[in-house]
Amino acid sequence: MSEKCRKYENRVTGMATVFPGEENADIILQEAFDSGLRGLKLHAHVQCFDMNSEHMNRLYECCRINKKPIVMHIGREPKSTAYGCDPYQLCSAEKLELVLKNFPDIKICVPHLGFDETSAYRKLIEKYDNLWLDTTMVITDYFPIEGKINLNDYRSDRIMYGSDFPNIPYAWDRELKELNAADISMDSLEKISYKNAADFFSIKLQPV
């Protein structure tokens, strides 16, 4: 990934991943940052980690020192028997709030608007400036959400467009069409589409 980032400089932003709890995970992560990767991506359902563990604290500290953001799938859904752990035991907005309090200098993004605790995560972005959410899948009608997500209810400077492309069960542009059709201002649309991501990943926007 770091080689791709160098090859396509200013066009590709690469993320690192490690397995929390593996030997020297923080050292591996530091090497990834030194190679040019711009943040850490984790998925609690797949990697089966407790975000409040000492193993994670070492990774948080590495990100803090290097001023790198974290994209962390810690919403409880989608739950699957294919996972080796129970997401409902590992994931919650309440558990994340402890991380936000203990590491206020780290930017953290939770995908899927934190589904299925979207209301709790919406409240958290009002309370903590170091939390972002992304829209992946939840502004379509794919997930069984009661009522349509209204982006006007959210803090517009803390929501990012997300897609999960190419691993999605619908057309690649479906979420983009939903976003474009949303009843939001042009300012909010620009923030959600790209400006908030540039802020989160510390990407310098190039003049068009």
Q: For each predicted feature, which ranges?
A:
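Conserved, mostly hydrophobic/aromatic
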Residues: 1, 5, 32, 40, ...
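Flexible, active-site-proximal loop/turn residues at the rims of small-molecule/cofactor binding pockets
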Residues: 46, 137, 165
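Short alpha-helical
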Residues: 23, 116-117, 141-142, 167, ...
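Alpha-helical elements of Rossmann-like donor-binding domains used by nucleotide-donor carbohydrate transfer enzymes
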Residues: 3, 27, 31, 58, ...
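Catalytic pocket-lining loop regions of alpha/beta-barrel enzymes
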Residues: 38-39, 52-160
